[in-house]
Amino acid sequence: MINYQDILNASDPKVIFLKCERHVIEDADYRAMDGLNQSYLKKVYTHGVPHAENQRLNPMEKTPALVMGSLFHTLVLEEDQFSSRYAVLPDIDRRTKEGKLLYAEFEAAAGGKDLIKEADLNTAMRMRDSAVPLMYEGIRPDKTNAMNEISYSGILEIEYKWEGEDERLELPFKIRCDMVALVDEGNGKVIEIRDIKSLASLSDSDVIGSAKSHLWSMQCAFYRDVVFAHEPKPSKFVYVATEKEAPNMSRRYVCSEEMYQRGRAQYKHALVKYAQWLKAGKPSTADYVGESILNA
């Protein structure tokens, strides 16, 4: 049985990136690659490995919110892919028999594309117009100092102590960055890893709430460390957040050093959980949960 308290009390783990490669590949090819990604590690950190495995094996169906987020992402970073991914619904009343038939015909003709309403497209385009100036700030017109939708993969080694014994395990990893840019800052150049987010609003409560609940800190740290392993230069992580509600404003959020360090501790914690799960023979949920001391 794996005791969560043992994980909490484990010595500070050490992560070494043994191999790190950069890839210019399509999203489908990235998804097919083997490796732990930030979404999986977040689930391990918050819920445990069995939940992360269940999420991996049973991907969540696309909700309207997910489609909207993906649409916004495409318009900002891959606008040339819009027509191959989305079909704009005509004005159809699906409450009527005729409307249901027309919708079914349109869906079949779309050939698997995501169906979006014209009103949602208009909102996403306003969001795009707001986000693009910030997302591409400092990027040359020919974009030679930036790469969109860039992937990295490799092998990392996690070292830690468990019940007084030294443990070591090599694990595959992968990340996909919205943008990696080399920008001028002060007397030198800095790598900026930029990620776009769509939020209900840019109120402090919405931004901080989303950052905490979705562990932006872990993504920031994991991505910075992976990119540094490939190219050891000063870097920072920037979120460009855009609100879904009018007037659809955008803002840059630069992750602090404290947030980065917190994220490093989080992803290392998740790696220890995963490593011990593997060493224990991939136990079932019931065997894995164990007992923890709660001091909430």
Show where each model-derived region lies.
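Metal-dependent nuclease catalytic cores that hydrolyze phosphodiester bonds in DNA/RNA
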Residues: 1-174, 289-292
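Glycine- and acidic
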Residues: 57, 204-209, 251-252
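Hydrophobic/aromatic-lined pockets within catalytic cores
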Residues: 76-81, 198-201, 228, 275, ...
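Surface-exposed cleft-lining segments at the edges of enzyme active sites
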Residues: 159, 165-166, 203-212
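Conserved catalytic cores of phosphodiester-cleaving nucleases, focusing on short active-site segments
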Residues: 175-209, 223
